[in-house]
Amino acid sequence: MKRYRNGEIWEFEHEVAVATNRPVILGLDGGTTSTVCICMPIMPFSEPLPDPLPVLARAVAGCSNHNSVGETAARETLEQVMADALSKSGSNRSAVRAVCLAVSGVNHPTDQQRILTWLRDIFPSQVKLYVRNDAVAALASGTMGKLHGCVLIAGTGTIAYGFTEDGREARAAGAGPVLGDWGSGYGIAAQALTAVIRAHDGRGPHTMLTSTILQTLVLSSADELIGWTYADPSWARIAALVPVVVSCAEAGDDVANKILKEAVQELASSVKAVVQRLGLCGADGKSYFPLVMVGGVLEANQRWDIGKEVMNFISKDYPGALAIRPKVEPAVGAALLALNEFMKECVQEAFRR
């Protein structure tokens, strides 16, 4: 273990009493908004897991997506949040047995290898390290650390990601709004804004979205919407209008309902693409598999429940799909995944002796 260039982050290891006899694992969920690190003790593998789970510490930091803030800033954020979690738990790096880092922007083996190399400079050589996309943490939060099934994330963006028990994986969507993340919060809201402009021009039908969106944004006319949109076209800012679209659909607006119905079809098609490529449904199309559903777009509303409608579409083709809404956050899922993978490797090493 080298003294990393950010060695001052770890100064607490020399200043506090550490419970070195208590082995721990770290689970990280890193995204464009925030990064969460969970520190948990090593637990004997059991079914079911203890409830509540014994979380020793939780730490939060900023963005850790290297595509958004650059590699140096992303590394510093990840290292700081891990140090904070260990400090809060009264542990240090010598107590760590496994780390699962699930972060957005890790989409290629070269991304994984770059982060693994950096992590190896921080932790002792015996620590097991696992680097994944943040969708994996979301899946593990629903399966309690088991890497099997499909996860559908629909928040500002969207992605469907699946794994088989023999290690195969596949994804659909998740390419960003320019390449068509329709069904995401950004996609839904962008279509609503487009509908308002079309109605204003006379190229589209009248819609309640016009008055409701203008009122929400405190604008006096649809012409002002153009300036508002391009003043800051950030994905999250646009996606924040989704509740307005849902409320208009619930009030019976045809245009808003059409937008949401198309979003449901897009989200369902992403899941179906992953299920088909991996054969999660079995040869007969009826086999059980967990479908973890995460993100604000999929949360239940008064009458227009997008998540429920997506599940209705999927169930017609795959009756074995079981919808799961996680009870723990993705960082806990990452920690449980680290625990499961660590235990598997321990068993394999024991058999080789």
What feature does the model see in each segment?
Residues 1-96, 120-123, 143-145, 149, ...:
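ATP-binding/phosphotransfer module of carbohydrate and carboxylate kinases, centering on a glycine-rich
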Residues 30, 103, 135:
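Residues immediately flanking
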Residues 81, 97, 103-107:
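Membrane helical hairpin/interfacial module
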Residues 100, 173-176, 305:
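Short acidic, glycine/Ser/Thr-rich loop/turn "cap" segments at secondary-structure junctions
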Residues 102, 132, 292-294:
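Solvent-exposed beta-strand sheet faces enriched in polar/charged residues
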Residues 102-106, 154, 251, 315:
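N-terminal loops that bind phosphate or other acidic moieties
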Residues 106-211:
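Phosphate-binding/catalytic loop of phosphoryl-transfer enzymes
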